[in-house]
Amino acid sequence: RQARDGSFEVQVHGWDWIEGHLSEHADLAVRYGLIAVASPDFHDATTASTIAKQIGSRLATAVELMNDRRSVNERFTLQSISKHLGFPDWRKLEAIIEGRPDVSASELVNVARALGINEQWLLEGKQTPFLVDPEDYRGAAEQFDSIQRLNPRRIVFVRQSEDDFESIVAAEIDHFRWVTFHWDHPTSSHVGGTGKYQLLEYCCLIRRLYRTFDHPGACTLQGKHLERADFMRLWAGDVYPGTFLHWGHNDHWWIDFAELATGRVEGTSDSARELREAIRIARVVLANHQGPSERDGWMRTQLVHAGMPVNEPKSAAHYPLDLGLSRDRIDVDG
């Protein structure tokens, strides 16, 4: 607004937005006396703004988290990340981290997406550092569609090794980027009426992902157990998924679960006992949906996609993941 002496008073609302656009309108900043944050040579200024410094600091934190538990030879460097981002060299990325350059919001969003960083966290410091798919799917079939669109090179079925024994899916898209899916699946006896169906739906999801992706040159499927604290950090996006999932033993719990192979689950731990019980419940639900073709069409469709037989005279000992692809199912003994 204009004062009586002819000067102007500028009241700024939404400073983040103003600061982000000053570099595009430096002439206006000078004209209206905003010399404190802009000067005639604004585009060449090396002094970082507060917001740019904060964004740069968060990006540096994200890279540090990405390198947690990685060996020297496996570390993500500014050079390797810059090459992945398509930058001509490492200098631009270094400048972003130092908060020096005039970088547009769209460029920062592209950096976040390419590295699997949460955009809101990078730009505003909200939520958690790493990308978690927030969708609340109506069923496992919808989650399959989302995973398929990402075309991952590795899929990991992560199960909590204690308490509720929940499971989530994490997908490695490329050497840098992971996506953790927030939608959790039951893998224990801690289920009600709906949860019983969700057990079989998760079984079908795993089978369908295997039958779609797991072949030479495509995608690798693996399993992992995590203690509750680490599981919750992964689920929330507080930790880079590769920290827990980059290396390590491939836990075959997911194969036993997907093949409904109760007899293969060994051990006396709570985790093993609950997995056996989850498989038993899922087998009961499966038996209730194997029958005349006019019955429960929505579930039959999922069973067909998962390679499950829908007209069974008796239950099988287990249902191989590649049933109908390369080998026949193994019938129950006796």
What are these model-derived regions, one by one?
Residues A105-W121:
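DNA major-groove recognition helix of helix-turn-helix/homeodomain DNA-binding modules
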Residues H84-V103, N110-A112:
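Recognition helix of helix-turn-helix/homeodomain-like DNA-binding domains
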Residues K126:
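Conserved catalytic/binding loops enriched for acidic/polar residues
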Residues A3-G14, I18-H21, H25-K53, L131-G334:
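Intrinsically disordered, low-complexity tails and linkers flanking structured cores
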Residues N118, P129-F130:
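A generic structured-segment signal
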